[in-house]
């Protein structure tokens, strides 16, 4: 799977970031897709950019999305769509009382548009990209909206309430839709020669990576209405710094650079995640 960065969030300085514009992907989508053939890639992740699509509440402009869909169909590319990739309309944050209703409205409008344009075709969506990361970024370290500190759990809870409601609305409109979660896959470890408390803290932090999908599947917070049926495919992101030592800010080096017995092979991380949910797994870029 290939991917084109589609984040549209407010950065730490309150300025809107639009990576589809910054990378010129929209202007070069024809050649971007043609270049995939060199690598035998025919599936890509894209994003609709919520902040662009819904500039007025409940009024949706999918004109750019339709152009992207048309180009994909012309070249035989399967798109996987992020509905929310870090960005929200200017009048919304995850903690706003209208957030869930607005997100459900967006999900329904997107599915209805797709069905009208391409009836009977397969649609794969990630409702909200990396809930684990964006709830930390916006809720704990003031990196984006709502610019909070010690609000990470509250932001995550609000995002997952909207996520679940959005999935239910989409599956009602299109029972054959595929829901692909996308979360970071990490390994959080204690320092060497650590105390038992350090080990417990690291273990708890490691398990926190699963909270979002646990909520989606109703293993946590069942009051939000999650269910295993709401998840079809497990998607993970994995980067060079996805294994770190708790409380230090230090990342483990790749195993082939400087072996550390605490390093966990990526294959083992994937196996652990699969055994937790027993869903097909996709590595997303």
Where are these regions (language model features)?
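Non-catalytic scaffold segments within catalytic domains of secreted glycoside hydrolases
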Residues: 1-27, 33, 37-39, 53-285
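Active-site gating/metal-coordination segments in enzymes
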Residues: 45-48
């Amino acid at each position: 799977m290939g991917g084109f960065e589609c984040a549209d969030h407010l950065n730490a300085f309150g300025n809107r970031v639009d990576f589809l514009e910054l990378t010129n992907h929209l202007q070069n989508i024809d050649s971007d897709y043609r270049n995939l053939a060199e690598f035998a890639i025919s599936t890509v992740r894209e994003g609709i950019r919520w902040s662009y699509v819904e500039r007025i509440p409940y009024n949706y402009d999918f004109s750019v999305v339709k152009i992207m869909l048309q180009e994909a169909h012309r070249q035989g590319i399967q798109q996987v769509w992020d509905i929310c990739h870090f960005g929200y309309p200017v009048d919304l944050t995850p903690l706003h009382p209208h957030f869930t209703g607005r997100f459900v409205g967006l999900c329904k409008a997107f599915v209805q548009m797709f069905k009208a344009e391409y009836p009977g075709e397969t649609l794969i969506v990630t409702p909200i990209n990396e809930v684990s990361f964006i709830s930390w970024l916006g809720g704990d370290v003031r990196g984006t909206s709502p610019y909070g500190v010690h609000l990470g759990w509250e932001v995550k809870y609000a995002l997952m309430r909207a996520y679940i409601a959005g999935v239910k609305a989409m599956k009602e409109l299109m029972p054959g839709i595929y829901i692909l979660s996308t979360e970071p896959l990490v390994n959080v470890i204690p320092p060497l020669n650590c105390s038992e408390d350090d080990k417990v803290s690291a273990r708890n932090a490691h398990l926190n990576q699963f909270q979002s999908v646990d909520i989606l599947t109703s293993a946590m917070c069942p009051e939000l209405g999650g269910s295993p049926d709401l998840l079809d495919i497990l998607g993970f992101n994995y980067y060079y710094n996805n294994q770190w030592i708790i409380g230090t800010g230090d990342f483990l080096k790749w195993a082939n650079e400087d072996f550390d017995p605490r390093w966990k092979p990526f294959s083992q991380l994937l196996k652990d995640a699969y055994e937790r949910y027993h869903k097909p797994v996709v590595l997303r870029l």
